[in-house]
A protein has these predicted regions:
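Extended low-complexity, proline/serine/acidic/glycine-rich cytosolic segments
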Residues: 8-10
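Active-site-adjacent core segments of small-molecule enzymes
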Residues: 2-4, 15-544
């Protein structure tokens, strides 16, 4: 009995001391104790939703008049409404605050205030996510990773939506729904289905190039901090002299790109589905602030007329030797969010959020994105989503009124129509804005050369090719035969060597799967479960 009392006393002393002694806790693990350390006393009286202080006798409702207990009514009536619609894509995510600092003079290319003035700092909020994972899914899926950056500039919010590979899957916005459906859960089984995945890839071979990037070492970066990110679209920039430039932005991690193999990701995933999220939070909480260099690949209007490829095609890379690269500045994340729902779940990023000097992309996919991103945010957050604190620009005066809260000051008593003669907000004339608009005519034809080039030149060595082929084989095993045959044909058309090696690996994997199905329980100990390209386990023999 004395031992038990002593043990309890020790625990109380440990907690009350607010010290960590010789135990090293990660910032993620010590969050609650850190809060207590910064608030030695309770932060105030608990109140009901309307502000009335809570009497301690109302905190227990057994054998009481529950009908008149407003605290109970507040609790029951609000808990069911704590969730908002989950994002259809990029649902599993995290984020942080930081700043962007201009390190190089790029006034030659754009008059955008955010990128002009060496040393200028602009606050940012960044959201990272996995492309097709649900909110409770795995960070370690072989999946597209995203990095959305919101710059709070003096001229409005600038949103750069980036992905972890430098090419996008398609260029026709009409395909957005179908690829989302095919890459998400099957409507009957509610499971990720590689048959639908490869079915749409073989019927729309334009997807092949981005698929190759995902099946390579670039498919699972070693956390968000060690990941490059690419806004993908070709942006039009305008200088103060009326000159136009066409650029592709790149965020290059200053830690250097690092990847996880499928086996490494499987080992981590068995212990921690939130590996990327934990790594980012702990790094910032420990003062190891992640950072990226922002640069842009540049083509002038004159250069544009000489290239022998479509520089606006988001499914392909620009050819080496046709452009030059210009550094702009550094993105640094130095502050974790205080409330995930407020700062990450409610954050709304829109490729249509641009600023003077950056007219933005001119391709058709970008035009489509500006529509469906806005529609998504209206559905998830309401039509006043830009009045939620994390989305609010530094300066805003509009003729938008009312609607579902938040409305904030709702422009108070200012005129609510334009034009008016009573001193409501007025527009200005942007003298530097280009007078002419570039019109890009695109084709729905696809070219297999980018995928061929990736296999032969971007995969830098034989070891990388072997991992790439193994990842493809792993995802083909559960696919039904007719679709597998089309996939094999497509791979053969891209590169004969690739097709033959994938076919050979596929046959070996099928044999291993059959052997496992026929094995005794003791024999199955030589097999283990590893995640597929989407982070969902399938059987294969131990590769060690």
């Amino acid at each position: 009995m004395k031992a038990i009392i002593a043990c309890l006393l020790y625990v109380v002393i440990q907690v009350e001391s607010n010290e960590y002694y010789n135990v090293t806790y990660e910032p993620v693990q010590r969050q609650l104790l850190d809060f207590k350390k910064h608030h030695p006393r309770p932060i105030g009286l608990w109140t009901k939703n309307a502000g009335e202080p809570v009497d301690i006798r109302d905190t227990i409702t057994i054998n009481s008049d529950q009908f008149s207990n407003q605290l109970l009514i507040d609790t029951i009536s609000t808990v069911a409404g704590e969730r908002i619609p989950e994002r259809v894509v990029t649902a599993k995510g995290t984020g942080a605050f930081g700043y962007f600092e201009v390190t190089h003079d790029v006034s030659k290319y754009t008059y955008a205030d955010v990128f002009n003035g060496v040393g200028k700092k602009t606050p940012v909020v960044v959201r990272f996510a996995s492309g097709f994972q649900n909110k409770g899914g795995s960070d370690l899926a072989r999946d597209l990773k995203t990095m959305a950056v919101k710059f709070y500039t003096q001229e409005g919010n600038l949103d750069l939506l980036s992905i972890s590979i430098p090419v996008f899957a398609f260029r026709d916005p009409m395909l957005s729904r179908d690829i989302t459906h095919a890459f998400n859960r099957n409507p009957q089984t509610n499971m990720y289905d590689f048959t639908s995945f490869y079915d749409i890839v073989t019927l729309r071979p334009i997807f092949a190039h981005s698929l190759f990037w995902l099946m390579s070492d670039y498919g699972i970066p070693n956390g968000y901090r060690k990941m490059d990110a690419f806004p993908v679209h070709t942006y039009e920039l305008a200088s103060k002299h009326g000159e136009k430039y066409y650029v592709r932005f790149n965020f290059r991690t200053e830690l250097g790109f690092s990847y996880l193999t499928t086996a490494e990701a499987a080992a981590i995933q068995s212990l921690d589905l939130d590996y990327f999220t934990r790594d980012l939070y702990n790094a910032i909480g420990s003062g190891q602030y992640p950072s990226w260099k922002l640069e842009m690949d540049v083509l002038s209007l004159h250069d544009l007329k000489k290239v022998d490829y479509n520089p606006f095609d988001v499914t392909t890379l620009w050819k080496n030797g046709t452009f030059y690269t210009v550094p702009i500045g550094r993105l640094v994340l130095n502050r974790n969010v205080k409330n995930h729902f407020r700062d990450v779940e409610q954050a709304a990023y829109n490729p249509g959020n641009l600023v003077p000097g950056i007219p933005g992309p001119v391709d058709y996919l970008s035009c489509g994105e500006r529509m469906y991103y806005r529609d998504t945010q209206n559905y998830r957050l309401g039509r006043n989503h830009n009045k939620i604190s994390v989305n609010m620009p530094l300066y805003e005066k509009t003729y938008v009124r009312d609607g579902t809260p938040p409305t904030n000051l709702n422009m108070k008593n200012a005129p609510n129509y334009y034009p008016n003669s009573f001193h409501g907000p007025v527009p200005y004339v942007d003298e530097h804005r280009p007078w002419k608009k570039l019109k890009v005519l695109e084709t729905n034809a696809f070219d297999l050369e980018p995928a061929w080039y990736f296999y032969n030149y971007i995969l830098e060595d034989e070891a990388h090719r072997l991992r790439f082929i193994a990842n493809i084989v792993l995802t083909l095993v559960p696919v039904t035969p007719p679709v597998v045959q089309r996939a094999m044909k497509l791979l053969h058309l891209i590169d004969q060597d690739l097709g033959e090696r994938v076919k050979a690996g596929y046959e070996v994997a099928l044999a291993a799967q059959q052997a496992l199905a026929n094995a005794t329980p003791a024999e199955t100990m030589s097999f283990r479960r590893v995640p597929s390209a989407e982070g969902h386990p399938i059987q294969m023999s131990d590769p060690r």
